[in-house]
């Protein structure tokens, strides 16, 4: 949902919607409707556009696949963004409804996960045998990457978003030094959550494999 003003007194200049479904459904509305009213100096960035920008230099066949949640696939955000930059690229997507539950319930590396990982990959490749690049269109999915790579043919490149989104933000700051100079650089991280801290810490440890500082907040 759109950001509430209670979130923006915190001192970060940027919000990254590190969720493909949120980026697909809410980013434009947040940027166009909410930020001008809350604080026009702040920025909210998504994860879909930075991922798409790299594709043109990677795919050789000009056929790519998207593995994502139902919300992201239904939004058609990936085909729309791809065709803005690369009209010649063919895009096919498949929903993977079991992948997020596998990650969030810490079942990603269990043998039972193999069935669902193989199932959705096969569905995608049956749609288009010329696919040579697959985007993991959900920020949960990199935790499944070791198993995904077991079932993806060797000639297909798998794109996890993290490094591309990070490089895009770095490039943004280089192009906007007036924003970069306002950013603190003390290498500290504080996580805010709207759910119970212990539940958040348990989930975050799966992703980050480190101790984190968490503060619970309430959206008004």
Regions found by a protein language model. Give the residues of each.
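Short, exposed "boundary/linker" segments that immediately precede the start
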Residues: 1-8
């Amino acid at each position: 949902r759109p950001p509430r003003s209670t979130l923006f007194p915190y001192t970060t200049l940027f919000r990254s919607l590190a969720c493909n479904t949120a980026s697909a459904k809410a980013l434009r509305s947040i940027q166009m409707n909410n930020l001008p009213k809350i604080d026009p100096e702040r920025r909210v960035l998504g994860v879909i556009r930075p991922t798409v920008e790299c594709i043109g230099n990677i795919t050789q066949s000009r056929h790519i696949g998207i593995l994502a949640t139902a919300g992201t696939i239904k939004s058609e955000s990936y085909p729309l963004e791809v065709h803005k930059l690369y009209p010649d690229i063919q895009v096919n997507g498949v929903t993977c409804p079991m992948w997020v539950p596998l990650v969030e319930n810490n079942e990603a590396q269990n043998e039972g996960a193999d069935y669902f990982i193989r199932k959705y990959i096969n569905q995608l490749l049956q749609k288009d045998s010329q696919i040579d690049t697959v985007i993991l269109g959900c920020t949960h999915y990199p935790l499944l990457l070791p198993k995904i790579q077991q079932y993806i043919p060797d000639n297909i490149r798998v794109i996890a978003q993290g490094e591309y989104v990070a490089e895009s933000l770095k490039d943004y700051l280089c192009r906007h030094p007036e924003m970069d100079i306002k950013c603190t650089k003390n290498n500290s991280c504080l996580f805010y959550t709207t759910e119970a801290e212990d539940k958040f810490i348990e989930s975050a440890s799966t992703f980050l494999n480190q101790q984190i500082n968490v503060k619970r907040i309430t959206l008004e």
